[in-house]
Curated annotation (Swiss-Prot):
Part of the 30S ribosomal subunit. Contacts proteins S5 and S12. It comes from the Bacteria. The keyword RNA-binding applies. This is Small ribosomal subunit protein uS8. One of its GO terms (biological process) is translation. Pfam families: Ribosomal_S8. GO terms for cellular component: ribonucleoprotein complex; ribosome. It comes from Shewanella halifaxensis (strain HAW-EB4).
Length: 130
């Protein structure tokens, strides 16, 4: 069976892995997933990520915990294949009053809501992380 929404699958694997206190989670790799993992690492939500180059590339994300609790409190898909959500530069959401991050896909690539606001850009809101 084919996967309808690979990004939602990635976010669910991270959510479930942290709920089960796993050290890392593995999933099929894709360019967009790697870009999202890079953003999560830059923002401090995951420890690291690695791509295993095999016949089927696999993305492994090392999860991050603080005093035994997952660093990621909520990770939620916003724009999905059946309902795309686009926001202009003035409409970009502030997740948890600025404490969280919204990952936005713009014409210049993936960026956080803060970076998109600074660059005066809007785009497709991929997910919220807090």
């Amino acid at each position: 069976m084919s996967m309808q929404d690979p990004i939602a699958d990635m976010l669910t694997r991270i959510r479930n892995g942290q709920a089960a206190k796993h050290v890392s989670v593995k999933m099929p790799s894709a360019k967009l997933k790697i870009a999202i993992a890079q953003m999560l690492k830059e923002e401090g939500y995951i420890t690291d990520y690695a791509v295993a180059d095999e016949a089927k590339p696999e993305l492994e994300i090392t999860l991050k915990y603080f005093q035994g609790q997952p660093v990621v409190e909520t990770i939620q898909r916003v724009s999905r294949p059946g309902l795309r959500i686009y926001k202009g530069k003035n409409e970009l959401p502030k997740v948890m009053g600025g404490l969280g991050v919204a990952i936005v896909s713009t014409s210049k690539g993936l960026m956080t809501d803060r970076t998109a606001r600074q660059n005066g850009m809007g785009g497709e809101v991929i997910c919220y992380v807090a």
